[in-house]
Amino acid sequence: MSKKKKSMYLHESASGAAPKIQRRYDPAFEVDAAYRASLPDMMEAAYAAIQGAHVPIQQVGVSNFKLPLKFRTKKGEILTLEASITGTVSLEADLKGINMSRIVRSFYDHKDEVFTGEWMGKILCAYLRNVKSKDARLKVSFSYPMLHRSLRSGLEGYQFYNVAFEGVLTRKGDYRRFIHFDFVYSSACPCSAELAEHARDQRGVYSVPHSQRSKARIVVEETQGKKIWIEDVHAHCLRALQTETQVMVKREDEQAFAELNGAHLKFVEDAARLLYREFDADEKIADFRIACSHLESLHSHDAVSVICKGVKGGFTADFMDFQSLVC
């Protein structure tokens, strides 16, 4: 008596039995309106289909979908840059979920337009309308190139900055715009510089004060009706700290950078206060928070500081993600 062939659900078995379910894709199949209308839609699920607590969700949506977007520089040049986009909306307690593809489609409907604060507001309104939600938020992150000249030789090179534009539209109709900006600089320790000079002066011993690559992460909120450019944020950082890391250098530039660091010694506390002074003086900026990290070459830990403008109901100094400032 022959043994019955054992079959599998999706694959032909080793004994030669055909699968119980045939897998195929029909590239010629075309969807018509009637077929589309027959497709199940989870948005139509009953209230009882909601799993877990029947409570609102503050943010639900999509993160890190990529799109080439157009950005205008302060000089008027249009740059097309790869952007990583996060878009979220609120979800009321009686709804199971949202149609996330509608958020993505909202961006594609406007992908050929130049990015502006108004563009962000238009996108937020569109996906509030498309998803039928009450609060919306988006964040567009990208690497922004700026051409800089070296300190003395005249060489030029591109510095790339981690930048993000963020927009928030609340159910009260408030629209808030933020710019996130990372600035990498060198910090030479004032204490170490003094001790090095003491060794040279008192004992004739040459020594090198410690300095290190450092990063400031700035987030600013634009004043209503005002426009602040990425280049403005960079200029504030450069005026405050002076010692931005260099791109293209010759020996004269390296020497100049050593002199520049000597002229602008700074603790991490100094960096925070210097930046505060610059950003606080700009009327186009309603609020800000600054986090600094000096990646100490003396210690096996980093020195950090956080400062905010102090606006009532605005930013607080609750930043703790210092590991993200490693550069």
Curated annotation (Swiss-Prot):
Gene name for this UniProt entry: folE2
Its recorded reaction(s) are: GTP + H2O = 7,8-dihydroneopterin 3'-triphosphate + formate + H(+)
**A GO term, aspect molecular function:** GTP cyclohydrolase I activity
| Protein name, entry field | GTP cyclohydrolase FolE2
Q: What is its EC number?
A: 3.5.4.16
For this UniProt record, the keywords arranged alphabetically read as follows: Hydrolase
The family this protein is said to belong to: Belongs to the GTP cyclohydrolase IV family.
What are the site positions for May be catalytically important? 189
Per the entry, what this protein does is: Converts GTP to 7,8-dihydroneopterin triphosphate.
Q: Which PANTHER family match?
A: GTP CYCLOHYDROLASE MPTA
What top-tier enzyme class does this entry carry? hydrolase
Q: Name one GO biological process term.
A: tetrahydrofolate biosynthetic process
Domain of life of the native organism: Bacteria
Q: Among its keywords, does the record have Hydrolase? A: yes
Keyword Protease among record annotations: no
Tell me the route in metabolism or biology where this protein functions: Cofactor biosynthesis; 7,8-dihydroneopterin triphosphate biosynthesis; 7,8-dihydroneopterin triphosphate from GTP: step 1/1
